[in-house]
Regions:
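Non-transmembrane, solvent-exposed beta-strand/loop segments in proteins
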Residues: 221-231
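Small/flexible residues
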Residues: 190, 205, 212, 277-278
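Transmembrane alpha-helices
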Residues: 1-156, 167, 215, 231-358
């Protein structure tokens, strides 16, 4: 049992050491390419902002985003090296089963998955706020400042509509607020413009309120009225990067809230939510594939295994990207879209495991 524990520690150290080395190596290359691509933008920004606001937050974001690739490369590389040095054969010949040999690999995968899940759920989203703010200021502004045809259920039975909203002057045009009681319209407020003040506080201008009571109607007109409407500009000014700046609990609450309000464009948020868990699970799947694939000693050396491993890992990332577009288009649910690659590659892992040397 003592020998097995030493082997476990040996494999875990090899796995994690290769994993973090692969991350460091690829990140160094990525930084060089990124500097070359955005050099003009970086020269406009203060050096401290480029280092601490951008790169300090970009590196963990990129490492976590492509963690499945780094995991696969690490498994393929060090397992192929073990097989090439006949260490796998020696372990199996000593009485250790292939199934038992899987244990330290899965322990390593669990460590990586837990780390990735924690980072993607709680650490990277706040860091992305700073990184994306830097990008919007110095590289390319992707802020959304306009929205049109906004319709939200702000409360049960209360529907708000804004024909157009301009965030530069915090003004909405052709605003209406309708209150229903069991599908019967009870009140309707209309205004030419509405100005955002602070949390839930708005000012309506050139307004008219129509209150309905059976066959009777009460009409109220005015030039300006401060009122509370439980909506924020962030509820409808949605950019592509917003989902990356929310922690998982925030993302869960936001999705639930927007669904209650009848907001349609939340696919990116649902995809991001499912992606975080699917990517963590991918660590186990790709570890199983990599170990089963590279545990056999081949005549061509470990270059063949590394080539096949890179092909499979890139195909996984490509497949994940393609299926996410299906979710955005509405062809499938975000959950199914994010988990289809894992399901298919789990089948591949099972097939390779059965064909691996025992």
């Amino acid at each position: 049992m003592k020998v097995l524990k030493k082997i476990d520690i040996y494999i875990i150290k090899k796995f994690l050491g290769t994993y973090f080395f692969a991350i460091a190596l690829i990140l160094a290359i990525t930084v060089m390419f990124d500097i070359n691509e955005k050099l003009d933008s970086f020269l406009k920004a203060p050096l401290s902002a480029t280092i601490f606001d951008y790169f300090f937050n970009f590196l963990p974001y990129f490492a976590n985003l492509f963690s499945p690739l780094f995991t696969f490369i690490a498994v393929i590389f060090f397992t192929s090296k073990l097989a090439d040095n006949s260490e796998i054969i020696a372990m199996l010949s000593s009485g250790i089963s292939f199934k038992r040999l899987f244990v330290p690999y899965m322990i390593s995968a669990a460590i990586i998955a837990a780390l990735n899940l924690y980072l993607s759920c709680y650490v990277i989203p706040p860091a992305n706020v700073t990184r994306i703010e830097y990008t919007n200021t110095y590289v390319k502004n992707k802020r959304v400042d306009y929205a049109s045809n906004i319709q939200l259920q702000v409360e049960p039975g209360v529907i708000a509509y804004i024909a157009r909203y301009d965030n530069s002057n915090k003004t909405g045009y052709r605003f209406s607020l309708e209150k229903f009681d069991k599908k019967v319209l009870k009140s309707r407020l209309t205004a030419q413009t509405i100005n955002y003040d602070s949390a839930y506080h708005w000012r309506v201008n050139n307004y008219m309120i129509r209150n309905f009571n059976g066959m009777r109607e009460e009409l109220v007109r005015g030039m300006s009225l401060d009122t509370i409407v439980p909506i924020e500009p962030s509820d409808f000014l949605i950019s592509q990067n917003d989902s990356e700046m929310m922690t998982t609990p925030e993302l869960r609450r936001y999705i639930a809230r927007q669904k209650e309000r009848g907001v349609a464009n939340i696919k990116n948020f649902e995809i991001e939510y499912e992606r975080r868990f699917a990517m963590a699970a991918a660590s186990f799947i790709l570890t199983a594939i990599g170990m089963s694939l590279s545990s056999r000693k081949v005549k061509g050396g470990m270059g063949i295994n590394i080539g096949i491993g890179l092909l499979l890992s890139f195909s996984y990332i490509l497949f994940s990207t393609v299926t996410s577009t299906f979710a955005v288009s509405g062809a499938t649910s975000p959950m199914l879209a994010m988990w289809i690659p894992n399901i298919i590659y789990t089948v591949i892992a099972v097939v390779l495991y059965k064909k691996a040397p025992k």
